[in-house]
Amino acid sequence: VIDTHLLALQLMAAQGALGAFDTLYHHEGTEALPRRGTAGRELAIHATRSSIYCALFIGLSSWAWHGAWAWVLLVVFGVEIVLTLWDFVVEDGSRLLPPTERVTHTVLAINAGAFIALLAMSATGWAAQPTAMVWQPQGWLGAFLALCGVGVGLSGLRDAFAARALFRRSAQEHVRAVEAPVRFGSRPQRVLVTGGTGFIGQLLVRHLVADGHAVTVWTRDARSAAWGFGGVVRCVQSLDRIPAADDVDVVVNLAGARILGMRWSERRRAQLLQSREGLTQQLVAWIAARPRKPWLLLSGSAIGYYGVQPQGDASELAEDAPPQAVFMSQLCQRWEQAARSAVAHGVHVACMRFGFVLGHQGSLPQLLLPISLGMGGRLGSGRQWLSWVHVHDLIRAMAHVWTETEKAASPAAAQAFNFTAPGALRQEDFTRIAASVLHRPCWMPTPAAPVRLLLGEQADLLLEGQRVVPARLLQSGFRFMFPDARSALTDLCRPR
């Protein structure tokens, strides 16, 4: 005779293990839901479901729910079924699930249906008993279920806080868009964006659409990108999908593989070059073949163009500062040179040398994590310069360069602009300010040696720096909303 109650608990244990995989691999890993701007409602549902599963795992691990408690259990099952169906609807409305996540969710739903049906059979018998939570230990199985309950409860808290942060961020961005809208040029244009699904690209596309521009995004996964943008932009996997009859007025080139990560082996260097120089060359070749050329190319670059500035050197680096013979500088030089070749086709080119971009996504959350845990401190000597920019100022600066170039009506030319705030500071000062904004201590330094051992030459991005100034932006009349690190971090870190 099969013990249906024991079988139900075993299926619950499988649910806990598979749910942990789904949370860690998909929600926190590949999909990064806590950092996805459109995932607030999904995370709120996850938080509610996690609290239900926490109660079920712990409550059924060692107790039988007799009498009125059996009816409570049946009601909880009903609520969970409704929330599961709602979760499916919200997920499909906000993002394109990868195949592995969709399969995992299907298996979880089938398994949940099985153990809920089996436990409902037990509950009908429990309902006839006097009302009580009856101790009924299940040995190691019960201990595992209780552990699953603790884990899913913590996951629910994580999702609840993340959902709250996303809702607040959305409200803040809405208020900012209403009170200080970003204007790109004097009239609606047709814009092609590469790298439009990245941290900066997503924000740029939203601002372009809000300003009335028709946006096309060139991306590797057009279907997923179109889903993520809610169908308001055209997404293509190949430039050949843009008909010759469809004019493009402005191109914004932000594409490029992530710099920080694996060591810079020869293979990795080739990937970084191909994703920047190679892609930009493809873009310029496409421009050359167009019957009507775009009039402006805004192309990404980085302050790594200037190489490494000795820590004892406090001189400011403007756009005319020379590059160096190190890989990061050479990468930026080749990237910019590929973009500048568009001038030969009558296109204005602006190379945007980005500093460390501060935003709710990107590298800042990882940088702030040890500080928020009370374990922040200087990195290496802490004397290296950190040139940064708030992401909202970066978007505004793009709009400014666009507008000023449109006004100039001069022959096609190429210029470089430093996209950094005027308030560059040393890394230890930045960390101290971040700890102050987060109300945390700043006491635990990270020595340079293990960082260099782990990353090799790439460690220069963290342990060395440049004191870069936005000379051309300031000379052309641009004004930063967040000129100093404290105002930028306060805007990004404090709840609204």
Language-model-derived ranges and their functions:
Residues 323-328, 353-361, 381-391:
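Glycine-rich "substrate-gating" loop/helix at the edge of Rossmann-like oxidoreductase active sites
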Residues 301, 337-360:
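Conserved beta-loop-beta element that borders a ligand/cofactor-binding pocket
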